[in-house]
Each structure stands twice: as structure tokens, then as C-alpha cells.
Amino acid sequence: MMKTDVVIIGAGAVGCAIARELSKYQIQVMVVDKNEDVGGDASKSNSAIIHTGYDASPGTLESQLVVAANPMYPELVKELDVPFKQIGAILPAITQEQFEQLPAIKAKAFLNRVYDIEYLTKEQIIAMEPNINPEVKGGLHIP
């Protein structure tokens, strides 16, 4: 009978990352999942953006973990020899109300130590994403 020290339930991105990290130690790790292969369900349906934590509640465990994890990705993808391009995201403001919320969103990002968010004009957003709603007022570029 095989001895298992740790059982990880779920073979998505998080479960596999935990298993990979634990494999560095002298313990037996087992990953179980309801699917036949890894990376199913939520992990295969994400937006392919590495979340920066710009909108997490400041001071929470989530914000601390996301901000701490971000610098780890370049080394991780190098070790795994997988393609990686951090292109960021556009947070468009279509309504005036959304546009007026942009400074508060940027301030929240700053509290989470996400400093390189940039304001985008309507023209910049349309140049970056020509198929966006033409009513866009402006937005933020989030790395």
C-alpha cells in the first residue's frame, strides 16, 4: 500500500502548483480530481491574465498573496519552459459613473502595491481594442 502524506483535491492550476511545490520535499503527494486530465474546469476557462491584485480589498490575505505571487511568474515559466507574455488588461469605463470610479480603483491598486496602472483615453483604448464599445469614456491599463 502506498503511503501518502498529503492529498490535494483538484488538479487545476492551484492544485498542480501546490503539488509541484510540495514535490521538492521528502513527502508523498497525491493529486485527485474528478476529471480525467489536469487543468479542467475553472483553470481551462480563465482569461489567461495573471491577476495583479489591483482590486482586492487592501490588507486582506488575498491582496497579500496575489501581490507576493506576481514576481514569481517569470522564474516559474522559465523553469517550466512554457510560453508567457504578460500583456495586462484594459479596464474600460463605458458609462460616466464607471469613468468617475477610475481614480478610486487606481487608489485601491496603490494600497495593494500595484503602482504601474495607467489612465487611458478613449482614443488610446480604441487604438488598443478597435472592437470596443464606441461609447467608452476612458479606462485603466492594468499590467
Language model segments and positions:
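Short, flexible turn/loop "capping" segments at secondary-structure junctions
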Residues: S43-K44, V82-K85, I132-E135
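Helical element adjacent to the flavin cofactor pocket in flavoenzyme catalytic cores
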Residues: L140-P143
